[in-house]
Amino acid sequence: MEEEGKKGKKPGIVSPFKRVFLKGEKSRDKKAHEKVTERRPLHTVVLSLPERVEPDRLLSDYIEKEVKYLGQLTSIPGYLNPSSRTEILHFIDNAKRAHQLPGHLTQEHDAVLSLSAYNVKLAWRDGEDIILRVPIHDIAAVSYVRDDAAHLVVLKTAQDPGISPSQSLCAESSRGLSAGSLSESAVGPVEACCLVILAAESKVAAEELCCLLGQVFQVVYTESTIDFLDRAIFDGASTPTHHLSLHSDDSSTKVDIKETYEVEASTFCFPESVDVGGASPHSKTISESELSASATELLQDYMLTLRTKLSSQEIQQFAALLHEYRNGASIHEFCINLRQLYGDSRKFLLLGLRPFIPEKDSQHFENFLETIGVKDGRGIITDSFGRHRRALSTTSSSTTNGNRATGSSDDRSAPSEGDEWDRMISDISSDIEALGCSMDQDSA
C-alpha cells in the first residue's frame, strides 16, 4: 500500500494553495533583495592604518561609514570611566536585559555614520531617516570595546534633554547601579551623559572609525588654536599700549581645549584586541586627564619664552610672519623666515610652535626641524612643550577623547562658551600687547 501511495504521487505536481504561498514568498524575497541592492554607495574613503585623511576633507567635506545602530542610553552618570570595559558593558548588559538594546543585530539595524569636523550624524541605511546628530564639541570620548564577536564603538556624549523618546533609550535599569561599581563615587548632583552604542563589522572597521574621529578632534583643535594664536599675537604685538604681567591674574577665565594630538598615527591606532575573559580585559582609551591642556597656558608659556629671547621689534616681526602664514604663505616660507629671525642661537624656539601647526603642514615642519638640527632634548622649549609629546607616547590605552561633555546644570549658570572665548582672547591679547612696553621698561 505504501508503494502504491508513493507511485500515486506524481512528481512536479504542486497544490494550488502551495503555489500561491510559494509565489508570495518568492516575491517578498525578491523585493527584499532588490531593497538591499538599491542601497546607494557611501561617500567614504578606505584607510589602511596608519594612513590618514587630508584635513581639508574633514573641514570642507564629509565621510560616511556603515555601522549598526543599537541605541542610545541616557541618564548615565557623567563620571563613567570610558576606559573601563567592565563599566561600559555593565550598562549595555542591563539595557539588553530590559529590552532597551537589541540582543541580536539584523539588517534592520544597519545605519550610516556621516562624519565631518562639525558633527557626527546617524541615519538609517534604508530610507536614510536621521536618527540623531551630535556636534563634535558634545563628544567627550570614543571607546572601542570588543565583546565576544561584537565590535562595539561607544560615543560618550553630552546629555541632550531635547532628544525625542523615539531616538533615545533611557537606561532606567542602570540607575540602580551601585556607586561602588563605577570608577568614581557620586557625591552630590551627578552630571548626566549619554552613550551612543554602535557596532562595526570587524576590529579593523572599529579601529578605522576611532582613527577618523581622532583626526576630527585634532583638526578642530588645531584650527581653533592657531586662529586664536594668530589673532592674539598679531593684534597685541602691533599695537602695544600698556603693561601687564603674563601671569598677573590667576583668576582670569580659562577655557580648557583639548591638546593637539600626536601627529603619528599610533595615537589613534589600536594594535591590541580586547577579548572577553582575557588576562586584562579593557576598552581602548586615553583618559581625558592625559590629553587635556589649556590653550591659554600653551600660549602664555610660549609668549613668556619669546619675551625673554626676542626684542620688541622681533616680536612684531614674528606676529607679521604668523599673519602672513595664516593668510596663504607656505609653511616652507614661514619656517625659513622664522629661522632667519631666530638665528642659530635661538632656533630651538621653533619647537614651541609645534602645537599650533596645522596637521597638513606638520610633517613639513617636523622635517624642517630635523634639517636644521633641532630635536627634542635641546633648549628650554623642549621642557615646556615637549612634555606633551612625551605624555602621549607613554599612554598605555587608546580611546580618542574630544572636548568634555557639556550640558550639565553647572554650564547653565556659567557664562556661555562664546563669552569665555572672547574673554580669554582679550586677556591673552592684553598680555601680549604688554611685551613690547615691558621689555622697553626693563632695558631702561
From Swiss-Prot:
Q: Does the keyword Zinc apply?
A: no
Question: Mind telling me which InterPro entries this protein's record contains?
Answer: CCM2_C (IPR032375), Malcavernin (IPR026159), PH-like_dom_sf (IPR011993), PTB/PI_dom (IPR006020)
Main localisation: cytoplasm
Spell out the subcellular localization from the entry: Cytoplasm
Origin: domain of life: Eukaryota
Q: What PROSITE patterns does the database record attribute to this sequence?
A: PID
Give the GO cellular component terms, alphabetically. cytoplasm; mitochondrion; protein-containing complex
Using the record's annotations, give every residue carrying the modification Phosphothreonine. Answer: 394, 399
What Pfam family does this protein match (any one)? CCM2_C
Instruction: Respond yes or no to whether keyword Ribonucleoprotein is given for this record.
Output: no
* Compositional bias segments (type: Low complexity): 392-408
Give me the ranges of the annotated region Disordered: 1-37, 391-423
Q: How does it assemble?
A: Part of a complex with MAP2K3, MAP3K3 and RAC1. Binds RAC1 directly and independently of its nucleotide-bound state. Interacts with HEG1 and KRIT1; KRIT1 greatly facilitates the interaction with HEG1. Interacts with PDCD10.
* Task of the protein: Component of the CCM signaling pathway which is a crucial regulator of heart and vessel formation and integrity. May act through the stabilization of endothelial cell junctions. May function as a scaffold protein for MAP2K3-MAP3K3 signaling. Seems to play a major role in the modulation of MAP3K3-dependent p38 activation induced by hyperosmotic shock.
Say which family it is in.
Belongs to the CCM2 family.
Indicate what this protein is called per its UniProt record.
Cerebral cavernous malformations 2 protein
Taxonomic source organism: Homo sapiens
